[in-house]
């Protein structure tokens, strides 16, 4: 009799279980508090997307108290389960000197892990590290490589950095026309970084790329 009841309740729970997509829809339509129990249930089942969303809720304090420690724990768990977005957020926590987890070396290594998982935002960050130096020595060739990887995934801030490198001749031969090509769309959208590069180097005067078409990425993905 007891076994029958146990099997009955297990069956009921299975029938009532929500998918990640269903819980995510609840969150978007009714708020994070309504979705919390669903995410927690899925997290117990090691659903990496649910664990990631739960971590975001704790990180931002979306309808609950902020809890950086819980967010860190959850991002780490989801990252270990292969969620590249969680790996990126984990790296951001390590990069913040406002947390007890601040560790620039660990931040860099974790961003690299996320970049290797094809996370575009992490690729952008690694590009910035190599462009600016500090955490790692400056390496303009690597910076451009990572900016291009991010740009190919439509991480549009990367186009502004590529434009800057071509306009300033940082690590590449100066090419104002190519800088124009990479900056133009984001400049027109009001992206502050691209606006600065556009104005600083007067890129409106150079509408055509007159340079040699070397390499496989001479204009941005739209």
Residues of each region from the PLM?
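Short helix-capping/linker turns of helical repeat alpha-solenoids
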Residues: 31, 44-47, 60-62, 81-83, ...
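Sec-dependent N-terminal signal peptides
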Residues: 4-13
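Terminal, low-structured helical/coil segments at or just beyond the last alpha-helical repeat
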Residues: 174, 178-222
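Structural signature of tandem alpha-helical TPR/SEL1-like repeats
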Residues: 28-37, 65-74, 100-110, 137-146, ...
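N-terminal leader/linker segments that initiate helical-solenoid repeat arrays
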Residues: 15-53, 214, 222
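Hydrophobic face of amphipathic alpha-helices that form TPR/SEL1-like repeat modules
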Residues: 22, 26, 53-60, 64, ...
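Alpha-helical adaptor scaffolds
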Residues: 85, 89-99, 105, 109-116, ...
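Canonical positions in the second alpha-helix
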Residues: 39-42, 78, 113-114, 149-150, ...
